[in-house]
């Protein structure tokens, strides 16, 4: 009986530690088709479900064409935070870009992903005179 109780408590404890306190509404966003040289932005939202304030240590993009912005102040329990990701649509073609978000006190980062396709921007039609 003691062994069963011990293993039940152990499993419950492991489950609590495995969960991230940041609960994102989404971790992947599809921009669809974007016009070349027109930056595109998406805001990823999350809620702090943990017992302590949540601090973002870093949000790092995989390349220079993607820029993440994140709050520097702690997100208190139950409050919402956002990470704004801007993609500079300079190169034509399909793209997949990642932003790695590291929270203080968490070993595993959260990976945010944006995808889409950059198409040629059509020139404005000439006005008839």
Report residues per predicted region:
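Long, low-complexity ectodomains and other extracytoplasmic segments of secretory-pathway proteins
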Residues: 18-39, 43-45, 106-129
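Surface-exposed binding patches on compact interaction domains or structured appendages
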Residues: 51-80
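Extracellular/luminal low-complexity segments enriched in Ser/Thr/Pro
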Residues: 82-91
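A short beta-strand micro-motif common to beta-rich folds, especially ectodomain repeats
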Residues: 95-105
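Asparagine-centered strand-capping/turn motif at beta-strand->loop junctions
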Residues: 46-50
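Surface-exposed loops/turns
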Residues: 36, 77, 91-92
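Sec-dependent N-terminal signal peptides
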Residues: 4-16
